Each structure stands twice: as structure tokens, then as C-alpha cells.
Amino acid sequence: MASRKTILIVIDGLTPSMFEAAIGDGRAPALTFLAENGSYTRAVSTFPSLTPVCLSSLATGGHPDVHHIPHLVWYDRDRARIVEYGSSFAALRAAGMARSILNAIINMNRLHLSPDAVTLYEALDDAGHATAAINITCYRGHTRHLPTLPAVTIPAYGPKRFFFYNLFESDPTGAPLAVFGRRQGSIDGYAAAVGRWLVTRDGFDFLVYYLPDYDFASHAHGPEGAYEALARSDAAVGALLDAAGGPDEFLDRYAVVLCSDHGQTNVERSARLQSAFADVRGVIVTASNRAGMVYRLPECALDTRELAQLLDADGNAETVLFRDGDDVFARRDGEEVRVERDGPLFDYPHGGTRAWAAAHNPNAGDVIVSAAPGVEFADLAGRHHAGGGSHGSLQAGDSEVPMLTVGLGAEPESIVDVAPTILRAFGVEPPPYARTLTHAA
């Protein structure tokens, strides 16, 4: 059993450079304290480097070929319809508001997340440990929770203690509403109130503490323009330290993993990935942020390689992936290479591993597109973050994350290493897919 209880803190979209600057100049005292007492490295996300995909990798210890969450927006072949998790409010509306909200909150965990993937909550609950989560969208566990809204009766199955934007609250904490005033950090403020309540009561063995407001600000202002949001995230982390009686007392009780789910880069212009396939019958294109997918329907006259070749002259697409049987190929600058599962791919961190896994996700498109520098693909409603920040591609800026561990004696190289690291700290054997992870330089 872990000598200390463990908290996984996820600051959505925090880049390594921003984290390093904040702890270097004292603007983030709580993060600085943890960094001074822990081990820090730059780690790598998964691909596409988008929040639902990345949080599923953090929770399961697997890439998308394991957990089956392919993107923020994708085409469900079995049901012949678009699944939209929240590229933008307008995109939710374009895909059907009620169905999209149900997909994002319930069906991602109940239907879309692979039953063969094992979440941290499931594994630790099975081993007799009390689990808790605040606001994270990949939450699948064994405990049934009913919504707080009387008119909504669909349950969620999550960790023992589960708090999700006031919609699911396993305990009455008195926390404020999470959904108003997000520019002022209302969601992180809600997390801080719940986290303080949990720590004060020593109410868990393992907690996921998810802070999304930094990503919201970084999309609006760019990755180097969200210092105020980072200060609020730091205050939310500081609330945990204070609730334990102070920083030293906090570390006496808890081990910590602190990371982000993905990076973020500046975007200068938007593009519609659909434009490259305007004259092609029998395809469905889904895209948002800095990654997109093309689904080939039976009536399409072009094979997947020919679809990928249509993007050779498109300056908005840097690298295009497709499968031929079990083999994965990548096209870049008009040239084609075979992707080795554990090998390098161009200059991308862990490029072969991440590209191979994305292409072997059964819910992924037949063609997967990683955007060119400075480009974002508009979503279903035409929304984008041009002039701000975005993520999703294979590029290092979108893919590298800060990784800080305190009290665990481990330095995860990838976000998929986090779950097995935590499980081993509790003396729980990770699932087989998480034991043989290898990484390319």
C-alpha cells in the first residue's frame, strides 16, 4: 500500500515553459513549493493532443488504441452520427445540443471508453482504496451517482466520491456554482472549495484534481498570455496545502503527480479541413483545434492513400496518417514513410508510438491530419481560436507537458506512464497494456 495518499493534479493546457517560468520567478508559490520538494521533467502527451483523448490516457495508462477515445469530435460508424464532446458551444449546438451534452458527460464513459481499458478509479476501488475525482471528464468507476438536478435521472458511474461541475456531487460541500464567471476562474474556484472540503476530512486515498480554467484563458490569449489564469490555478493548488494545515503537513500526508494533459501553441489562422474534400463523395470530415479526421464511407471511390494524397498540396496539413491493413503510413511534404510503432517519426516527440496508436483506434478516421504550425481547423460551427492558442497536433509545442512528482520516486516520460506509476505506488499491478510501454526519442 502507498505510504502516503496520492493526489493527481491536472492543470489543463499548461505548457512546460509557462510552468518553468512561474516557479522560476515566484509567481506561483504553491507550485514552486511542490517543485522544490519533487522531481520535474518535460513529458509527452498522446495524439491527438486534445483534452478528452489526453484525460482518457491519464486515467487508463493507455494511448487511444487502448481507450478508443479518438478526438473532440468524431464519427460513430456504428450509429452513423457525429459525436461532439465540446469543441465549442456552437459546435455542441450544431451537432445537437441535448445529444452532445449526453455524449460529453455520460456516453464518453458509459459507451465510448473501451471496456478493455482500466481506469485508475476501477483498479484502486477493486483493491479497496477510496477514490475521488473533481471535474475530470474521464471518470469511469464502480459507484453509481445521480445528478443533482431532479429532472435529470441518468446516473453516472464514477469513483466513490465524485464531483462534476455541480451536476454530480456525492457529498454536500457548500461549494459555489462552477459554471459562471469562467474568465475569473470559477471552475478552478469550485474545485478548490471541494478539494479543501475533502482534504480537511481526509476523505480519500486517491484524488484527481482537475483544473481547466488555464486552458480556457490560453485559448483566448495564447500560451504565453495566461499568467492571471495560472495564478488562479496556483491558488487552487494552494487551497489543498492550506487545508492540510500547511505545506509541510500536506507533504506528510500526500504524494503528488502534477502535470497537464497537453501543451499549447499560438495559432495565426484558421482553415476548413473539409475544403480539401469538397469534390469527394462518400467522406465525412471531423475537425477542430489542430487535428482532424476523414472517414471513408463505402460509396467513396478513393482509397485511403488517395484520400491522404489530396492533402499533399494543402499547406494547412503538416502530416497525414492513414492505415493500409495493420501498417500505418505518414505523408509529409509529398513523401510517404511507414510508421514504426516504437520508432521515431520526423521530429515529433514519441512520434511513432503516438501516430501508430492514433491510427489503430477503431473509432478514428481512416485519415488523421496533424495541422501545420500556426494553423487551427475550424469546428463544426466554424469556430476557431485564431489569434490565441490551440493544440491537438503531433508537434512538440502541442505535445510536451510539465511533469512533477513528489514522494513517488518516479519520473513519468509520458502521460500514459502516470496511471501505472500511481497504481504501483499503491501496490496494485497495472493492466497488461500499461506494463510494456516503450518510448522513442
Walk through the language-model features, giving the residues of each:
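Short, structured active-site-proximal loop/turn typified by the sulfatase FGly-forming signature C/S-X-P-X-R
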Residues: E20-V73, A132
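Metal-dependent active-site segment of extracytoplasmic phospho-/sulfohydrolases and closely related
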Residues: L8, A30, R232-L273, I368, ...
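Extreme N-terminal starter segment of soluble prokaryotic enzymes
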Residues: A2-I7
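A structural signal for short, well-ordered beta-strand segments and their strand-loop junctions
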Residues: V10, R42-V44, A130-I136, F206-Y210, ...
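Active-site neighborhoods of enzymes that stabilize oxyanions during catalysis
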Residues: D116-A117, T286-T421
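His/Asp/Glu-rich, glycine-adjacent segments
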Residues: G62-A220, D327-R331, V339-L345, A378, ...
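Active-site metal-binding loops of divalent metal-dependent hydrolases
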Residues: G13, S260-G263, P373
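Active-site-proximal segments of metal-dependent phosphoesterases and phosphodiesterases across multiple
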Residues: A220-D234
